Curated annotation (Swiss-Prot):
Its cofactor is Mg(2+). This is Copalyl diphosphate synthase 1. Keywords: Isomerase, Magnesium, Metal-binding. InterPro entries: Isoprenoid_synthase_dom_sf, Terpene_cyclase_plant_C1, Terpene_synth_N, Terpene_synth_N_sf, Terpene_synthase-like, Terpene_synthase_metal-bd, Terpenoid_cyclase/PrenylTrfase. GO terms for biological process: diterpenoid biosynthetic process. SUPFAM superfamilies: Terpenoid cyclases/Protein prenyltransferases, Terpenoid synthases. It comes from Selaginella moellendorffii (Spikemoss). The gene is CPS1.
Length: 739
């Protein structure tokens, strides 16, 4: 496995302008450029040779392993025109024209979603050139009229005076407009690298019309870089940097490449603008897809970044990927939706973007149209559906990883001006490493659970209804699904024992135990003497002894991790939590409701003892007051309590956030109060995310535990619902190896 890690690390350390497959379509345009010295020869004869040497058996050019009619015909016509321009390769041209005549009617049957970028602009222009060259194809085919109509609609959205004077996406397809535009104006929109919006075809056309030296330099560099051919777009540096980081994270292997990922994101951050970014540095045109991916990754890694960039893509009540676009791309809206998930309080633009993107994606799901115009991937519908059904605040990392390992493919194909592949974004090495890592962690987690089972069997907890073996498995799953790294084995065991114990205690006092028993348990925790338990029930004695043994064991381990005694801190954690349970019990028995503020301030989630105990075991040394002075625990408790109350069981119906909210706002209906509490829960999750990502005294690894805990409570909000929802998740993460 470590050989795979080093291979990936080598890839990451070699990132530059992007690894991308070549394009026959763009290479054909470069091959058409006449020699700038005035001789009747091509400026790039090596590109002409590449065309003649790379025709496929059926007479077309393009991706050998994937046939899309639009793509193949567009490339075939471009190559035929290039060869005919220089009166060479007659047999190759004849074979290409046969392919075009035979295949053109199939364009009417192919989904227009898979039409190459700018096809409706460049293809009609090539048809006119083919006619002028007297190439033998059907110029009366009905499908051509449809394409001409699409061209007219697009040009109406972006008028020619705009194209010639302002950066737009049509700079990427100027070869389709070369007879009508003013090249003296357009060349002023040239990118610093000499290209026209990083399009080799568009730049080749500009070179033909202007002889611009920077255009020539750009194409010379590309032809040399790609061995006599060119890609459909270049560079793709920001795109590659971002999508690699995204894939590594979703595959669960990013922890092996912490420094390399930081370098990649530092690079992207360097080119971030207040209007967003595009696929390449220095682009005069930004797009919502790359901007969304960059925003989400940068923010989640702690970079200071403003969501105001999304105003670039807001048009009234809608959001677009590009100004003047013909239609929305599923992946663009998918990434916009994902970006909205890292929203901080008060960020209205992200709230609006997320709402719009979700509505769009839900509509596509209902219509069974979750496929995209920019990528052909293994399971895009599954990716989108998982994101919609599992928002970030209610998603467990290892479950998402397990799902994405099944969805990731090494051979995804992207749709640009022609089909292309990104070998550093999609490759078999990533997948092989992800599977090996997942199976390694799963095997370790199974051994740890066996250790927990032995502890359970040796305890007396099984006599209580709330301490079932299935609940033990489920609490361990919550740890394995969030703090999964092999080196954090003690943290997982401590988390599991603590949450298992707090859930069982909570259930006992909800259904069976008396207020006096709870008070007795708290008194025993205060005395902390297992040999002097006072006059309390047998069950309280058992609960205290089990709690005592757990805390004592954790205290011994904690000394090794912290270099000091943490026993007092661990005891205080349980005393605080049990006292909150007592306060809640007294409120339920009383006729006087607390205010919502009082209620939330006094609420301590059942998962709190697990989180606050585990922070000492994640590899960070904590000063005595670090945790006490942090507001993050209260934020987690508030968010968790609000979520639990919106899914409340009947036993809690007498006292929860909704009943209190109704008491304070009697004019509201129960459903209206529920909506208000749900909105409050979402706002508190945003506050918790903000607190987690901000620098502070508490280390990041510790803060992440509190965020993970709140997410767990969002996934499994009610203790009586845990088993039903968890069973399949436990099986996938703990029991099933990845094949």
């Amino acid at each position: 496995m470590w050989e795979l890690v080093e291979t990936v690390r080598s890839m990451l350390n070699s990132l530059h302008d992007g690894e991308i497959s070549v394009s026959a379509y763009d290479t054909a345009w470069v091959a058409r450029v006449p020699a700038l010295d005035g001789s009747n020869t091509p400026q790039f004869p090596m590109c002409l040779n590449w065309i003649m040497n790379n025709q496929l058996e059926d007479g077309s050019w393009g991706d050998r392993d994937l046939f899309l009619t639009y793509d193949r015909i567009c490339s075939a016509l471009a190559c035929a025109i290039a060869l005919k321009t220089w009166n060479t390769g007659d047999k190759i041209v004849h074979k290409a024209l046969e392919f075009i005549r035979k295949t053109m009617p199939k364009m009417e049957l192919e989904d227009s979603t898979h039409m190459p970028i700018g096809f409706e602009i460049v293809f009609p222009a090539m048809i006119e050139e083919a006619m002028a060259l007297e190439l033998d194809i059907d110029y009366t085919a009905p499908v051509l009229q449809t394409i001409y109509a699409e061209r007219k609609k697009k040009l109406e959205r972006i008028p020619m005076n705009v194209v010639q004077n302002y950066p737009t996406t049509l700079l990427h397809s100027l070869e389709g407009l070369h007879k009508t535009i003013d090249w003296d104006k357009v060349i002023k929109l040239q990118s610093p690298d000499g290209s026209l919006l990083f399009s080799p075809a568009s730049t080749a056309c500009a070179l033909m019309h202007t002889g611009n030296e920077k255009c020539l330099q750009y194409l010379n560099n590309l032809v040399k870089r790609f061995n006599c051919a060119v890609p459909n777009v270049y560079p793709v540096d920001l795109f590659e940097h971002l999508w690699i980081v995204d894939r590594l994270q979703r595959l669960g292997i990013s922890r092996y490449f912490t420094q390399e990922i930081k370098s990649a994101l530092d690079y992207v951050y360097r080119y971030w603008t207040d209007k967003g970014i595009a696929w390449a540095r220095g682009s005069p045109v930004q797009d919502a897809d790359d901007t969304s991916m960059a925003f989400r990754l940068l923010r989640s890694h702690g970079y200071d970044i403003s969501p105001d960039a999304f105003k670039t893509f807001q048009e009234g009540d809608s959001f677009v990927c590009f100004s003047g676009q013909a239609g929305q791309a599923v992946t663009g809206m998918y990434n916009l939706y994902r970006a909205s998930q890292v929203m901080f309080p008060g960020e209205t633009i992200l709230e609006e973007a997320g709402s719009f993107a979700r509505k769009f994606l839900e509509g596509k799901r209902q219509e069974n149209q979750l496929y995209d115009k920019w990528i052909i991937s293994k399971d895009l519908p599954g990716e989108v559906e998982f994101a919609l059904d599992n928002p970030m605040h209610a998603r467990l990392e290892r479950l998402a990883t397990r799902r994405y390992i099944d969805q990731y493919a090494a051979d995804d194909v992207w749709i640009g001006k022609s089909l292309y592949r990104m070998p550093f974004v999609n490759n078999p090495i990533f997948l092989e490493l992800a599977k090996a890592d997942f199976n390694m962690c799963r095997a370790l987690h199974r051994k740890e659970f066996q250790q927990l089972e032995r502890w359970y069997d040796e305890s007396s907890l099984s006599m209580f209804k709330g301490f079932s073996r299935s609940k033990l498995e489920q609490t361990f799953y919550s740890a394995a699904a969030t703090i999964f790294e092999p080196e954090l084995s003690p943290a997982r065991l401590i988390w599991s024992q603590c949450w298992f114990l707090s859930l069982g205690i909570n259930e006992y006092f909800d259904y069976q135990g008396s207020t006096k028993e709870l008070e007795d348990l708290i008194n025993n925790v205060e005395r902390w003497n297992v040999n002097s338990l006072g006059n309390c029930s047998a069950k309280v004695k058992i609960l205290f002894v089990e709690l005592y043994n757990i805390v004592q064991n954790h205290s011994k381990q904690g000394f090794l991790y912290q270099g000091r005694s943490i026993g007092g801190a661990l005891r205080e954690i349980w005393k605080t939590w049990l006292s909150s349970l007592l306060q809640r019990t007294k409120w339920k028995m009383s006729d006087n409701y607390p205010t919502l503020e009082e209620y939330l301030k006094a609420s301590h989630s059942s998962i709190e003892p697990a989180v606050r105990s585990t922070v000492y075991f994640v590899g960070e040394t904590l000063a005595t007051g670090d945790l006490k002075d942090s507001a993050i625990c209260q934020m987690m408790n508030t968010a968790s309590r609000l979520v639990q109350d919106t899914h409340t069981d009947k036993v809690d119906s007498s006292l929860n956030s909704i009943t209190i909210y109704l008491e304070e706002n009697p004019q509201l209906t129960e459903s209206e109060a529920l909506s208000q509490v749900q909105a409050l829960a979402n706002k508190n999750m945003q506050k918790l995310l903000y607190e987690t990502l901000q620098p502070g005294a508490l280390p990041q690894a510790c803060k992440q535990l509190f965020l993970n805990a709140a997410r767990i409570m969002n996934v499994f909000p009610g203790t009586n619902k845990v088993q039903a929802k968890l069973s399949n998740h436990v099986k996938r993460v703990l029991s099933q190896p990845v094949l």
